[in-house]
Curated annotation (Swiss-Prot):
Transmembrane segments: none annotated. GO terms for molecular function: rRNA binding; structural constituent of ribosome. Keywords: Ribonucleoprotein, Ribosomal protein, RNA-binding, rRNA-binding. One of its GO terms (biological process) is translation. Part of the 50S ribosomal subunit. Forms a cluster with proteins L14 and L19. PROSITE patterns: RIBOSOMAL_L3 (PS00474). One of the primary rRNA binding proteins, it binds directly near the 3'-end of the 23S rRNA, where it nucleates assembly of the 50S subunit. It comes from Treponema pallidum (strain Nichols). This is Large ribosomal subunit protein uL3. Belongs to the universal ribosomal protein uL3 family. The keyword Metal-binding does not apply. HAMAP family: Ribosomal_uL3_B (MF_01325_B). Residues 134-153 are annotated as: Disordered.
Length: 208
């Protein structure tokens, strides 16, 4: 398994040799620095900690800077990847070329926030009739029973804040890799807004 930290640029479309159009999401992968390594003897599992993004010196506190090794500048985003198959060392810089041998990716990001929404938009409720004397249009309806149990159970679908959740889309095929621009194009949509931080890893279900 290999992983990288990237930034969502946006969506576009590309054409193959047959002239068929394919919608793709462009993800920019800047230099990923190996911040740290974890081994089985000390931590109980093996993992690689990657970081990317520059930080202003005025924004760096001493406790935050203390977790980085010497000659490694503090980075804005860090992520731990377990089961990393590449042999890397602390301070090594990774780029989009590590994905050249990968065919499918799992992409994880924070979805767009929609704010406070009702049950029709949030959960897909059909709602009531629009006419013929109906007084029930977009309401949630009943949320439970009567005297027994006399309460509403947990996890009942109700209005509330929608979005801004961690979402993982699996098995996105890599359509194109541009080493010069440092971008990877994956088939389909990726969660999050443009310029959002996304985490790429080898598709777990494709490795089996």
């Amino acid at each position: 398994m290999v992983g990288l930290i990237g930034q969502k640029v946006g969506m576009t479309q590309i054409f193959d040799a047959r002239g068929c159009v394919t919608p793709v999401t462009v993800i920019r992968v800047e230099h990923n620095v190996v911040v740290g390594l974890k081994d089985v003897e000390r931590f109980g599992y093996s993992a690689v900690i990657l970081g990317t993004g520059c930080m202003k010196k005025s924004r760096i506190s001493k406790p935050y800077a203390g977790q980085f090794a010497e000659r490694i500048p503090p980075v804005r985003v860090m992520r731990e990847f377990r089961g990393f198959t590449l042999d890397v060392s602390v301070g090594q810089v990774l780029d989009v070329r590590v994905l050249e041998s990968v065919r499918y990716l799992d992409v994880c990001a924070l979805s767009k926030g929609k704010g406070f929404q009702g049950v029709v938009k949030r959960w897909g409720f059909s709602g009531g009739r629009s006419s013929h004397g109906s007084k029930f249009h977009r309401e949630a309806g009943s949320t439970g029973q009567c005297t027994s149990p006399g309460r509403t159970f947990k996890n009942v679908k109700m209005p509330g804040r929608m979005g801004a959740e961690r979402v993982t889309v699996q098995n996105l095929r890599i359509e194109r890799i541009d080493v010069g621009l440092g971008v990877v194009m994956v088939r389909g949509a990726v969660p999050g807004r443009n310029k959002a931080t996304v985490f790429l890893r080898t598709a777990v279900k494709r490795e089996r």
